[in-house]
């Protein structure tokens, strides 16, 4: 919506809807929606490539625990698909805005090995830095921190923690927390995240931006804000116990 409201650009959305929902579509003649995988981007956008100014690549597999259960899907999206996106932008001199994750930079970078998700995202950052050195590739990197707000996924295996709490609250059932519950997270509203992405794109500085609230909250603290009963679940693989925030 920021781009629609503040620019004259037309927008093409490429999504395989593995987690996306068509109910979130914006009704506008300036927006074209295409259902496909990012690994097909060169073929799908062949007719448009000369007219594309910038590409916002936010469509990757983006869950830690689920990446253990669906590792092939994670690699297919984050490694194979993203490589095609990078190559498409590089070949056609298109500016890239890429969403990174705090999961890959925690514990002085060691957390990148905690899960297939964090690992693939970390490797993408290494690749981008090399593409910059090798080919002077232009891009902005935006680090997302537990984004929540309208349109968040509330149900299914890819639901967000706030989305899960919201759904359970509406159903008047106990809020489920993965033990120990003291895991701390920095949460960022979707509107603030979008504003930061727009800022980075407009500034065009080829920089890394870390978008986060200054304060961290434990999962238990967040759950208690709903004034609901709490049910604890067994610990999960790849769980991080603190959000990461570094100087960018």
Regions found by a protein language model. Give the residues of each.
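Glycine-rich "substrate-gating" loop/helix at the edge of Rossmann-like oxidoreductase active sites
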Residues: 114-117, 145-159, 179-190, 239
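Short, surface-exposed alpha-helical segments at coil->helix boundaries
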Residues: 22-23, 125, 163, 216, ...
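C-terminal substrate-binding subdomain of Rossmann-fold SDR/epimerase-dehydratase oxidoreductases
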Residues: 169-248
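N-terminal Rossmann-like NAD(P)+-binding domain of SDR-like oxidoreductases, especially those catalyzing
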Residues: 1-147, 191
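Activation loop
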Residues: 63, 101, 124, 157, ...
